[in-house]
């Protein structure tokens, strides 16, 4: 695990974005951890979050021309990541996001920011069912752009109803790479170095045994 990944986990824990305990998910599964990126909700939080996304993007090796943030959670992520790439990596990358409702006056349309073109890196918080990705693909294709990859904060590495995860479905269906700042395996490695969190480590390992994808 790289230093920025460990720092991201600590950042998420400090902000209670990542919590351990017993949580009922929408799927009905009882999870020993919960991740809520909506709690990154201050200016300093967003500045730090952008730096983690930028570090992971520079680390992943996927070439891209533009950041796209799907409404609504992807909008601040795309914005802060673009700022971090410019300030910390000398990469001045254009960004774009969509409106849920098309505007009928002014500039009109449902896209805001730079023209949606070239190789697009879609940035979002997590992928649960892949619905937002599918909706975004319709927008990207309509503009004649191509999806270079998808960047998220956490990959739960968890099966859906079938044998693969929503992330693996996205990679299969759209022939792109999904990059995460951290994965569940990274969280487990972090817990392995924290003897005081041993009970959480046992619970997370058991959950992975039951619901984890085959990598």
UniProtKB/Swiss-Prot annotation:
* Gene Ontology MF: a single term: orotate phosphoribosyltransferase activity
Cystine pairs: none
Binding residues for 5-phospho-alpha-D-ribose 1-diphosphate: 26, 72-73, 99-100, 103, 105, 124-132
Gene Ontology cellular component annotations, sorted alphabetically: cytoplasm
What cofactor requirement does the entry state?
Answer: Mg(2+)
Task: Enumerate the residues binding orotate.
Answer: 34-35, 128, 156
PROSITE patterns assigned: PUR_PYR_PR_TRANSFER
One GO BP on record is: 'de novo' pyrimidine nucleobase biosynthetic process
Residue intervals passing through the bilayer:
none
User: For this protein, what is the EC number?
Assistant: 2.4.2.10
What pathway, per the record? Pyrimidine metabolism; UMP biosynthesis via de novo pathway; UMP from orotate: step 1/2
Entry annotated with the keyword Glycosyltransferase = yes
InterPro entries documented for this protein: OPRT, Or_phspho_trans_dom, PRibTrfase_dom, PRTase-like
Catalyzed reaction equations: orotidine 5'-phosphate + diphosphate = orotate + 5-phospho-alpha-D-ribose 1-diphosphate
- Please provide the record's keywords in A-Z order: Glycosyltransferase, Magnesium, Pyrimidine biosynthesis, Transferase
Q: Which NCBIfam families match?
A: pyrE
The record's family statement is:
Belongs to the purine/pyrimidine phosphoribosyltransferase family. PyrE subfamily.
Binding partners and assembly: Homodimer.
- What does the UniProt record say this protein does? Catalyzes the transfer of a ribosyl phosphate group from 5-phosphoribose 1-diphosphate to orotate, leading to the formation of orotidine monophosphate (OMP).
What is this protein identified as? Answer: Orotate phosphoribosyltransferase
Encoding gene (name): pyrE
